[in-house]
């Protein structure tokens, strides 16, 4: 018989840097899950990723105090800022443009994000990424 799910916990944790301090400790502690076990498993799973990049994770908590987790891809906004060389997006995105992306850079981000996007094909994924970039005040050439 399947385990009874008691809840889901959604967090964004830097790759390879999960530790028991907030936000991880309190979120897992509320569900009485083993915090250190999660931290070790998460750090092992994100070992090959670039250290420090935020990784969204969905933790499924079960009634027997066990858990499973699913790693998502890094948020598009973080990847856009990284490729455009920005520290933050524009305060007025449709007025002040703060950077530029080429179509090939947008395709690179779309390839990374494809698993988490609902886009039917690569062109739709690129347009989705271009829309995210525009909403941050980053121009996208060729889209």
UniProtKB/Swiss-Prot annotation:
Keywords: Methylation, Ribonucleoprotein, Ribosomal protein, RNA-binding, rRNA-binding. One of its GO terms (cellular component) is cytosolic large ribosomal subunit. One or more lysine residues are methylated. One of its GO terms (biological process) is translation. Gene3D superfamilies: Ribosomal protein L11, C-terminal domain (1.10.10.250), Ribosomal protein L11/L12, N-terminal domain (3.30.1550.10). Forms part of the ribosomal stalk which helps the ribosome interact with GTP-bound translation factors. This is Large ribosomal subunit protein uL11. It comes from Nitrosomonas europaea (strain ATCC 19718 / CIP 103999 / KCTC 2705 / NBRC 14298). The gene is rplK.
């Amino acid at each position: 018989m399947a385990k009874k799910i008691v809840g889901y916990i959604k967090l964004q944790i830097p790759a390879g840097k999960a530790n028991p301090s907030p936000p991880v400790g309190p979120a897992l502690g509320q569900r009485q899950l083993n915090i250190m076990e999660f931290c070790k498993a998460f750090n092992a799973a994100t070992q090959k990723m670039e250290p420090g990049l935020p990784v969204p994770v969905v933790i499924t908590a079960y009634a027997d105090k066990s858990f499973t987790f699913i790693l998502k891809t890094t948020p598009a906004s973080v990847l856009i800022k990284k490729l455009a060389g920005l520290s933050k997006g524009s305060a007025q995105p449709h007025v002040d443009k703060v950077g530029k992306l080429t179509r090939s850079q947008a395709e690179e981000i779309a390839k990374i994000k494809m698993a988490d996007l609902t886009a039917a094909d690569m062109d739709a994924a690129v347009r989705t990424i271009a829309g995210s970039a525009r909403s941050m005040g980053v121009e996208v050439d060729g889209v």
